[in-house]
Amino acid sequence: MGGENSAKEDPVPKITVLQNNQQTSQNSQQNVSNVIKQEKPNDDKRQLSKEEEIELDKQYNNLKKSKKIPIVYCSYINNDKTHWKIVFLGTSGTAYEGGYFQVELIFSDVFPKNGPEAKFITKMFHPNIAKNGHVCMDLLNKWNEKTTIENVFYGIIDILDNPVPENGYSNEAKKSLEEDYQKYQDIVEEYTAKYAMEGF
């Protein structure tokens, strides 16, 4: 798996891959276990109110049970319920096909009034994703208390497949997409092969 983790983690000997994804074979489950890390306990994690913990637990469990999002792994980072790591499969028939993409979600103390910060751990080439992995997406900027984390991943997958350069960053990916779409697609495929299939 490409990119750099924001938390220091040790190899995990065993991983439970979500069973609702029929594309995930036994071999790919083993491959995921080779690159997903086990987080260390974090004594500095924020103390949650009972209401915050209930809401985060609900969102987390609903995401793990989703049958529409191609998620193969979902876990807390450093055993912190406000810091999640999610791995999902790229959409078939796109430049992301075959890739395993890591995203982290960071929930501040104003959640659920404001949405989480979403960042790709996997290195990406995309006009709506900054060099540091930060995702620029309307849904995250126009959050309301009825929005779900499942909605967030619908949005993330949709924006990968359908970039919105006018709402993105002034970066190389935006320039490439606007000037030569095929060249842009070729670069995305290269990134997928180099950073999202590492170890597979």
Please report, for each region that a protein language model flagged, where it lies by residue.
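UBC/E2-like fold recognition across ubiquitin and ubiquitin-like conjugation systems
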Residues: 1-100, 106-200
